[in-house]
Amino acid sequence: MKKLVLMVALGLFFATCNSEKAAEATTGEAQKVIANGGGETVALDSGSTVAWRGFKTYVQDEHLGTVNVQEGTFEVAEGKLVGGKITMDMTSIICTDIGNERKRGYLERHLRSQDFFFVDSFPTAAFEIVEVLDPSAAKKYSTVTGNLTIRGTTNSITFPADVVVSEEDVKFMAPTFSIDRTLWGAKYHDRDDATIAESLKDDLIDHSIELTIEVKATK
């Protein structure tokens, strides 16, 4: 049975106003996923994690943490990556850079709350590959399009990635790109009962989330 060794590093940055932001992924409506029959399906390693990093906008403040990969698969056909899905357990989100247990617990509860990822109602998030286009003569990277689902909201995102499929493994590396978290409802004032103060707090956190993905699949 073939095994997949997956290492995913998703650096999420709520970048400060003075920081140079990464290129923004093209975001649109969710796209239809077409099944690719006849290929090889490989299960993701259960020990994989997602790393995150967040910033405030107007002050120098950041935090780091991880989210566990719950399950998923990759699909390979004729030597190419043609599909796949990664499901993340949002209830597992933790902060790793705060030593004080009380402060760390407060942040983790806040991230799991309705203000952000609302894990009681939406315990998982997922990225499902729709299409992988080979690089052209003018482009170094492949172009990857997939459906990203957070808080039950699905949007398509398109970004460049270095995809290498060999007899030994599959390597997937996406240079840092950003998305707007508010398009997935991750904002204080998404609640009907949100106060003006809560809405102002959301403006202290940059709406751009920067993502960096590295995946290695060993056959």
Where are these regions (language model features)?
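Sec-dependent bacterial lipoprotein signal peptides
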Residues: 1-15
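Low-complexity, acidic/polar, glycine-enriched regions of mature
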Residues: 17-219
